[in-house]
């Protein structure tokens, strides 16, 4: 059985989950810190001949770590710095996502050529298909959901209603619980929660440092990148990388 869920249905489902919480044994939580491990298959990500000289079976899987800090209204998904990754560091993206559920808004910091790009926009509205498939991730029972981004791209997510905020890695949200697993259909990029701590985040962790930088909307940024780099041979690759999850 597969169930379709949109933004309008989500509040009812989350509300129902929270109601159950008060009659349960206290297993539902709306705050915490989740450490994620991301595995990227570099052979699937880079298929041109130049990159094949740098990537082989021994180093094709690149591992990055992230953390998701959250309470009942706000969250931040951010990379955990690894000073040992050396020259392979540029091969994968490491972005920051701040989400504010009450305001239905998000602030994103994208990394591009060693510089940061700042984006403020509304929370994405995705149509999820919830399936009957289940698995346990880091001690939490999860259910599988599918998002069809376009005709050629499907994203799989595993969420748990035991953590009630509808958030997840890379700004993915909109399910009746927190996403603990996220993957592209071909397995080229996979996120899984490795540890979950029930600790409340600090307010300063949930507030981005905007400085005096220019802030774009997603529509404005896409238009600028297409205009500036759309005619270059590497422009499409950069565009796909930046907006893979958006």
Regions found by a protein language model. Give the residues of each.
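Bacterial Sec-dependent N-terminal signal peptides
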Residues: 1-34, 244-246
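Extended soluble regions of mature proteins
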Residues: 27-246
């Amino acid at each position: 059985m597969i169930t379709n869920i949109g933004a309008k249905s989500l509040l009812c489902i989350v509300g129902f989950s929270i109601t159950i919480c008060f009659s349960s044994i206290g297993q539902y939580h709306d705050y915490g810190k989740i450490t994620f491990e991301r595995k990227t298959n570099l052979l699937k990500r880079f298929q041109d001949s130049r990159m094949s000289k740098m990537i082989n079976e021994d180093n094709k899987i690149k591992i990055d770590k992230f953390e998701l800090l959250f309470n009942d209204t706000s969250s931040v998904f951010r990379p955990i710095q690894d000073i040992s990754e050396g020259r392979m560091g540029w091969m994968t993206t490491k972005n920051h996502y701040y989400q504010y559920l009450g305001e239905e808004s998000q602030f994103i910091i994208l990394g591009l050529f060693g510089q940061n790009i700042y984006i403020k926009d509304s929370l994405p509205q995705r149509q999820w298909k919830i399936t009957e498939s289940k698995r346990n991730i880091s001690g939490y029972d999860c259910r599988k959901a599918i998002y069809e981004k376009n005709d050629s791209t499907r994203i799989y997510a595993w969420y748990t209603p035991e953590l009630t905020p509808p958030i997840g890695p890379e700004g993915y949200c909109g399910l009746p619980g927190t996403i603990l697993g996220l993957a592209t259909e071909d397995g080229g990029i996979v996120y899984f929660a490795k540890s979950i701590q029930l600790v409340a985040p600090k307010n300063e962790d949930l507030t981005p440092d905007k400085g005096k930088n220019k802030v774009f909307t997603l529509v404005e940024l896409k238009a600028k990148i297409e205009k500036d780099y759309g005619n270059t041979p590497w422009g499409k690759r950069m565009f796909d990388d930046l907006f893979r999850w958006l």
